[in-house]
Amino acid sequence: MPRERKERDSKDHTKMKEEGGSDLSVRSRKRKPNVPVFLQDPDEEIAKIDKTVKSQDSSQPWDDDSACVDPCSFIPTPNKEEDNELEYPKTAFQPRKIRPPRASPLPVLNWANREEVWRIMLNKEKTYLRDEHFLQRHPLLQARMRAVLLDWLMEVCEVYKLHRETFYLAQDFFDRYMASQQNIIKTLLQLIGISALFIASKLEEIYPPKLHQFAYVTDGACSGDEILTMELMMMKALKWRLSPLTIVSWLNVYVQVAYVNDTGEVLMPQYPQQVFVQIAELLDLCVLDVGCLEFPYGVLAASALYHFSSLELMQKVSGYQWCDIEKCVKWMVPFAMVIREMGSSKLKHFRGVPMEDSHNIQTHTNSLDLLDKAQAKKAILSEQNRISPPPSGVLTPPHSSKKQSSEQETE
């Protein structure tokens, strides 16, 4: 019986293969997935695909040139009119012309690409912005309070023999921090100022003063813990952007380029120290006035250099044109008049500071009195300009020949 059953099963299996049936002798024991299975006739699917391809070919004929079209090329949108050139209405607004970037005045550098260095310097001025109207955010403060604080920071820098760069870093940190806050009271100004100087000294000085020394100069108004707390608050508010190109940094570049030698080596300063100190004293006075925040640091340094040199030299070493600095130069006139009346101070020498670095140490003069004189002159000049406005542009004396001819005509 078993033998006959096996023969019968083999015959049935052979018969099913001949009729085109599937081999069902081996069955899967796995459970079927709980998903529906859609069956479709293969011939029917192929017929649909052919029909779709034919319809696409008939609607979009093949173009030999389309195979060579650049995938990044501009393809106009159908049924859309081309945009005509924008026409500005005749209003008070006039589109400003895009000025080319300032050309690099730097000499050839053997340690870097001068164009790359100059580009980084220009980007610094775009990154580190200040607000000239930051006092509007603090109704309880006045511009005089800022001047008193910065004058005191200059005195602290001279006592601890800190560099000019350290002071101007602290000034930048203070102004940018105040622009990010609101409703600061007067009693916090000294803490903010000394904390800004504490941060700047750790960035710039090789041997910065200790924390207790900064607390000591406040005469008990600020403790070390308060300075550390304010330091963290300031750095968070400044988003840890602590490397601006300060006013004195720009001045250092301009004066160095003006006195660069024929070899083009600029690894060490090669300019007269007295010239640098004279221009720096003008900037020390200008920075006490809150109006200086209206101008970029590079413009302030170039304007100060203009007051002690010439337009040609300023253009050569800074890349600015007269129209770029005209407003700042006129704003700086009363401050320059006060500095000239005072006369240039002698170069100070500090114990333990090398002679070649003495011009970089921040000094302190009776700056608040000079500021009062400058603001008084500014008021007088403003009244004179209101009565008879001066012509715009650079004022130059006439040639000697024209001057003689005019004198003969008057006779």
From Swiss-Prot:
Keywords: Cell cycle, Cell division, Cyclin, Nucleus, Phosphoprotein, Ubl conjugation. GO terms for cellular component: centrosome; cyclin E1-CDK2 complex; cyclin-dependent protein kinase holoenzyme complex; cytoplasm; microtubule organizing center; nucleus. Phosphorylation of both Thr-396 by GSK3 and Ser-400 by CDK2 creates a high affinity degron recognized by FBXW7, and accelerates degradation via the ubiquitin proteasome pathway. Phosphorylation at Thr-77 creates a low affinity degron also recognized by FBXW7. The modification Phosphoserine is found at S104, S388, S400. Residues 1-44, 381-411 are annotated as: Disordered. InterPro entries: Cyclin, Cyclin-like_dom, Cyclin-like_sf, Cyclin_C-dom, Cyclin_N, Cyclins_cyclin-box. The keyword Ubl conjugation applies. The modification Phosphothreonine is found at T77, T396. PROSITE patterns: CYCLINS (PS00292). It is found in: Nucleus. Residues 1-20 have a biased composition (Basic and acidic residues). It comes from the Eukaryota. GO terms for molecular function: cyclin-dependent protein serine/threonine kinase regulator activity; kinase activity; protein kinase binding; protein-containing complex binding. One of its GO terms (biological process) is Wnt signaling pathway. Interacts with CDK2 protein kinase to form a serine/threonine kinase holoenzyme complex. The cyclin subunit imparts substrate specificity to the complex. Found in a complex with CDK2, CABLES1 and CCNA1. Part of a complex consisting of UHRF2, CDK2 and CCNE1. Interacts directly with UHRF2; the interaction ubiquitinates CCNE1 and appears to occur independently of CCNE1 phosphorylation. Interacts with INCA1. Belongs to the cyclin family. Cyclin E subfamily. Essential for the control of the cell cycle at the G1/S (start) transition. This is G1/S-specific cyclin-E1. It comes from Rattus norvegicus (Rat). The gene is Ccne1.
